[in-house]
């Protein structure tokens, strides 16, 4: 790619077509996509009902800006908040949603200090990059936005040491996806929430990767019955169309009046048409129950076939956000899997990250397990 900045280490594959879990490259080779576009295409590629909703909106109007009323924004916001005391700000991506959350927290509390966690990932714009607890993400960009403090994840004593009356907010992921697929301990998450309330700090949960059914509930924080002051969405909210959302408790709106924040494209009708259909699908009776059944089936097979392998250190995650920690580099495994027709990701040097569409079939799960088995067992033999 001669005319594009080299900001990505791209795989040598050009995906040109997709349907459900299956994608096809420019040479005609097909793959099982167990990346979902990095947890984006939760309903698979080109789901018929979402495609129809987009096509219908395309024929009417795409963009009007936020100068005008938008019934579609209100409709999607209602589906997200589902009768709770929350309001929504629409934007175009996860990093923008997190920027909005950080701005709201500081403006509402009048405080600057924000606690985040080591190995976290919240985005690459300056505010969300500053919130990210990874030095490699910060390198080369000069002075970060001040006021951020990073503490070890799942470590309540370190957290207690940093939390004080000057803390505006605490920002966390219930599963650190980019940081190695590290689930937050349920008791730790609950205690963090309790301590935030006691200190008067807002709790912000970054649901960009864990939201929209990925962990088996509509939002990942519902796994542990948390009640965040603010949470953020993107990725699966548009199933490939650019949309993000910052969701906050209604009383916070006193700090976010006209002129306090904005977005030219945020909440555009085309992305919202997709989001509405996606949310309606996920809220259908039995949808998430089926996701959980398939995820349990997949997890059982992973543990049955791979836990005993010498090179497999751990299998962890929730729902269809799964990490396999290896005793060696993950990159060669990902390459060989791709050659055999299975696309997965890494989450660090030795972590395989597996993110199939929520609509994956049992037969596709079986096929993926077969490919994984052939490659991981071969890697084990090769290391002996």
Curated annotation (Swiss-Prot):
Co-factor requirement: pyridoxal 5'-phosphate
Sequence positions that bind N(2)-acetyl-L-ornithine: 124, 263
Modified residues (N6-(pyridoxal phosphate)lysine): 235
One GO CC annotation: cytoplasm
Domain of life: Bacteria
Keyword Cytoplasm on entry: yes
GO-annotated biological processes: L-arginine biosynthetic process
A Pfam family this chain is assigned to: Aminotran_3
Catalytic activity: N(2)-acetyl-L-ornithine + 2-oxoglutarate = N-acetyl-L-glutamate 5-semialdehyde + L-glutamate
Entry's EC annotation: 2.6.1.11
Keywords per UniProt: Amino-acid biosynthesis, Aminotransferase, Arginine biosynthesis, Cytoplasm, Pyridoxal phosphate, Transferase
Residues that coordinate or bind pyridoxal 5'-phosphate: 94-95, 121, 206-209, 264
A GO MF label: N2-acetyl-L-ornithine:2-oxoglutarate 5-aminotransferase activity
Compartments, record wording: Cytoplasm
UniProt cofactor note: Binds 1 pyridoxal phosphate per subunit.
Note: May also have succinyldiaminopimelate aminotransferase activity, thus carrying out the corresponding step in lysine biosynthesis.
Family label: Belongs to the class-III pyridoxal-phosphate-dependent aminotransferase family. ArgD subfamily.
Matching NCBIfam families: argD, PRK01278.1, PRK02936.1
HAMAP family reported for this sequence: ArgD_aminotrans_3
The protein's name in its UniProt record: Acetylornithine aminotransferase
Organism name: Listeria innocua serovar 6a (strain ATCC BAA-680 / CLIP 11262)
């Amino acid at each position: 790619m001669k005319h594009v900045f080299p900001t990505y280490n791209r795989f040598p594959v050009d995906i040109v077509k997709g349907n459900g879990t299956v994608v096809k490259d420019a040479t005609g080779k097909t793959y099982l996509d167990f990346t979902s576009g990095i947890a984006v295409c939760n309903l698979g590629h080109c789901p018929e009902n979402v495609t129809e909703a987009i096509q219908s909106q395309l024929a009417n109007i795409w963009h009007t800006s936020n100068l005008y009323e938008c019934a579609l924004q209100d409709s999607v916001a209602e589906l997200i908040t589902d009768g709770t005391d929350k309001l929504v700000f629409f934007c175009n991506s996860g990093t923008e949603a997190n920027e909005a959350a950080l701005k709201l927290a500081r403006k509402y509390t009048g405080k600057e200090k924000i606690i985040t966690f080591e190995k976290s990932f919240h985005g690459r714009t300056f505010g969300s990059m500053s919130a990210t607890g990874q030095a490699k993400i910060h390198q080369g960009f000069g002075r970060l936005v001040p006021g951020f403090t990073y503490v070890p994840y799942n470590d309540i004593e370190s957290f207690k040491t940093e939390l004080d009356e000057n803390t505006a907010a605490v920002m966390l992921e219930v599963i650190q996806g980019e940081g190695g697929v590290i689930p937050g301990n349920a008791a730790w998450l609950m205690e963090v929430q309790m301590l935030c309330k006691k200190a008067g700090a807002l709790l912000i949960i970054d649901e960009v990767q864990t939201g929209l059914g990925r962990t088996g509930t509509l939002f990942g924080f519902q796994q542990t019955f948390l009640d965040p002051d603010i949470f953020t969405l993107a990725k699966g909210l548009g199933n490939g169309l650019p949309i993000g959302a910052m969701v906050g408790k209604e009383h916070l709106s006193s700090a976010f009046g006209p002129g306090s924040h904005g977005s030219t494209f945020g909440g555009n009708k085309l992305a919202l048409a997709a989001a509405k259909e996606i949310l309606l699908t996920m809220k259908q009776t039995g949808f998430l129950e089926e996701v959980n059944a398939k995820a349990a089936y997949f997890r059982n097979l992973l543990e049955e076939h791979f836990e005993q392998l010498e090179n497999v250190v751990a299998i962890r995650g929730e729902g269809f956000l799964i990490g396999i920690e290896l005793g060696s580099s993950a990159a060669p495994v990902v390459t060989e899997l791709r050659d055999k027709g299975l696309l997965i990701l890494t989450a660090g040097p030795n972590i395989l990250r597996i993110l199939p569409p929520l609509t994956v079939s049992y037969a596709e799960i079986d096929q993926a397990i077969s490919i994984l088995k052939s490659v991981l067992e071969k890697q084990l033999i090769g290391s002996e």
